[in-house]
C-alpha cells in the first residue's frame, strides 16, 4: 500500500493551487506502518492576470492501520491542510499538524525573538524532515557586529521537546559533548548550538576512518547518565535500542521487536516479490534475538550511528554527540549494534572499495564482544542491517547487498 500521484493531485486541487512541475518526490516508511510522501512542487497560485509561480512542499500521510483519520489528527486549515476522502492527510509545509513549531519558519519576528537577533537577519536551511515526527533546520544569523553565528533548530512534538531538553541537559551535565540548548523549548522548537568537528560518517571512505579507537566510544558510552524518570524515546530510524516501551517487562523485547516488524513490512513495500524471503529472514532474526543475552539495563544513546558522532579532522577524538533524543535506560549492546551495522552497511555500499571500512567494522565488533554477548550483538547488528536494507532511498542493488550483510552477521556466530 502506498500513496499515489492521484492523491497528491487531489490535495493540490483541494488547496486551490495548480500543479506545474515536480522537483523532488520522496517516500517515507515510518514505524507503525505509517507512510508519508513528500513532494517539492512548483505550483501556480491565483488566477490569470494575478497568478504567481512558487515552490512549495506538499506532504501526504497515511496510517493503513487507521485509515479513517479523525479531523482531530489533522485539523483542516483552508488552503493549507486537510483530509482526502480516503483518509489521506495532506498539508503544505510547514503546516505539519504534529509539529506546530514549524510555523516559525514563516514568521521572521518570532524567529528573531527565539534567536535574539533582529528580524530578517536569519537564513534557514532545511536539513531533515520526517513528517509528523521531527525536522531539523540550520540557521545562520548575522549579529550587530556582522558576525554570522550558526545554530540549529530541532522541531519536535511539544511534549517530546520538553523531554529531549531534559535529557540533553542531563547528558551535558555528565560531560557528554552534546549541543547546548540555547533556550527553553517553545512550541516544540529546540534551539541548539553547533558542536565542533565534523561527522565521523564524512571520513568513512578515507584513511581517517581507522583512526577512531573503539575504546573512545566505550568511554563516551560510560559517560551517559541514567535518566530513571525518562523512558527512552522512540528510537531513530535504524536504532536498535529501546523503542519507547514504558515498562521494563516490555523494553527488553519491545525495541528490537518493533524494529523487526518495521524492517519486514518496509522490505515488502519496497520489494513485494521478496515477501517470502523477508518472512524467512524475520523468523531467523526473531530466533537470534531470543538466543542472545542483551545484558543489564544501562544508560544508552539510542541512535549511535556515525553521523551522530562528531570527530576532529584526524578522526581520532570525539568532539560532539548529536541526537541524544532517545537517551534513556536500555542495553549497551544496542548502541554497539547500531554503530557497527552502519559501518558494515557503509562497507557494503562501497563495494570493492569497502575493504578498509570492513576492517574498521571488524575492529569495533571485536571490541564490543569484550563488553557484550556476541550472539546478542550479532542478532542486533543483523536486525539494524535489515532495517537499513529497507530504506526507500537505497537503490535495489544496495538493499539486496545490505540484506546479504544481515545474513552474514548471523552466520558469523552460527545463527
What do these predicted ranges mean?
Residues 1-188, 192, 200-201, 211-236, ...:
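Phosphate/pyrophosphate-binding loops and the adjoining catalytic core of nucleotide-dependent enzymes
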Residues 1-2, 237-251, 316, 411-415:
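Actinobacteria-biased recognition of intrinsically disordered, low-complexity terminal regions
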Residues 36, 135-139, 190, 287-334:
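Active-site acidic catalytic loop and adjacent metal/ATP-binding pocket
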Residues 106-126, 229-240, 246-301, 369-373:
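An alpha-helical support segment within catalytic cores of ATP-dependent transferases
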Residues 152-157, 202-211, 265-275:
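Acyl-group handling in specialized metabolite and lipid biosynthesis
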Residues 156-159, 294-296, 324-330, 343-356:
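Short, contiguous acidic/charged loop-to-helix segments that flank catalytic cores in large enzymes
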Residues 195:
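Residues forming the ATP-binding cleft of Hanks-type serine/threonine protein kinase domains
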Residues 335-369, 382-400:
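Active-site activation/catalytic loop segments of kinase-like enzymes and analogous catalytic loops
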Amino acid at each position: 500500500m502506498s500513496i499515489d500521484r492521484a492523491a497528491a493531485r487531489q490535495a493540490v486541487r483541494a488547496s486551490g493551487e495548480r500543479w506545474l512541475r515536480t522537483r523532488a518526490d520522496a517516500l517515507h516508511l515510518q514505524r507503525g506502518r505509517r507512510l508519508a510522501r513528500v513532494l517539492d512542487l512548483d505550483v501556480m497560485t491565483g488566477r490569470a492576470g494575478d497568478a504567481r509561480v512558487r515552490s512549495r512542499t506538499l506532504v501526504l500521510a497515511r496510517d493503513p492501520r487507521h485509515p479513517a483519520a479523525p479531523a482531530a489528527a489533522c485539523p483542516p486549515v483552508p488552503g493549507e491542510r486537510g483530509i482526502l476522502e480516503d483518509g489521506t492527510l495532506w498539508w503544505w509545509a510547514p503546516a505539519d499538524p504534529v509539529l506546530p513549531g514549524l510555523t516559525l519558519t514563516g514568521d521572521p519576528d518570532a524567529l528573531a525573538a527565539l534567536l535574539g537577533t533582529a528580524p530578517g537577519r536569519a537564513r534557514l536551511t532545511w536539513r531533515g524532515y520526517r513528517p509528523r515526527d521531527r525536522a531539523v533546520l540550520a540557521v545562520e544569523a548575522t549579529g550587530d557586529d556582522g558576525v554570522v553565528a550558526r545554530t540549529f533548530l530541532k522541531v519536535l512534538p511539544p511534549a517530546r521537546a520538553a523531554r529531549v531538553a531534559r535529557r540533553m541537559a542531563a547528558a551535558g551535565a555528565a560531560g557528554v559533548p552534546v549541543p547546548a540548548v540555547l533556550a527553553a523549548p517553545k512550541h516544540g522548537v529546540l534551539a541548539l548550538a553547533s558542536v565542533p568537528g565534523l561527522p565521523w560518517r564524512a571520513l568513512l571512505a578515507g584513511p581517517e576512518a581507522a583512526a577512531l579507537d573503539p575504546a573512545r566510544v566505550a568511554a563516551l558510552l560510560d559517560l551517559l547518565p541514567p535518566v530513571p524518570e525518562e523512558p527512552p524515546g522512540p528510537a531513530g530510524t535504524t536504532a536498535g535500542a529501546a523503542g519507547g516501551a514504558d515498562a521494563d517487562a516490555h523494553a527488553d523485547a519491545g525495541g528490537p521487536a518493533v524494529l523487526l516488524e518495521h524492517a519486514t513490512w518496509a522490505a515488502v513495500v519496497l520489494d513485494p516479490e521478496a515477501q517470502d524471503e523477508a518472512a524467512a529472514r524475520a523468523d531467523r532474526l526473531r530466533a537470534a534475538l531470543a538466543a542472545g543475552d542483551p545484558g543489564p539495563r544501562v544508560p544508552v544513546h539510542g541512535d549511535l550511528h556515525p553521523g551522530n558522532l562528531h570527530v576532529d579532522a584526524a578522526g581520532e577524538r570525539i568532539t560532539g554527540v548529536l541526537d541524544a533524543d532517545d537517551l534513556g535506560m536500555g542495553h549497551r549492546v544496542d548502541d554497539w549494534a547500531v554503530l557497527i551495522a552502519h559501518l558494515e552497511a557503509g562497507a557494503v555500499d562501497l563495494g570493492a572499495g569497502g575493504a578498509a571500512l570492513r576492517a574498521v567494522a571488524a575492529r569495533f565488533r571485536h571490541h564490543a564482544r569484550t563488553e557484550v554477548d556476541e550472539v546478542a550483538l550479532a542478532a542486533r547488528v543483523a536486525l539494524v542491517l535489515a532495517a537499513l536494507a529497507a530504506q526507500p532511498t537505497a537503490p535495489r542493488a544496495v538493499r539486496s547487498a545490505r540484506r546479504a550483510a544481515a545474513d552474514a552477521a548471523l552466520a558469523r556466530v552460527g545463527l
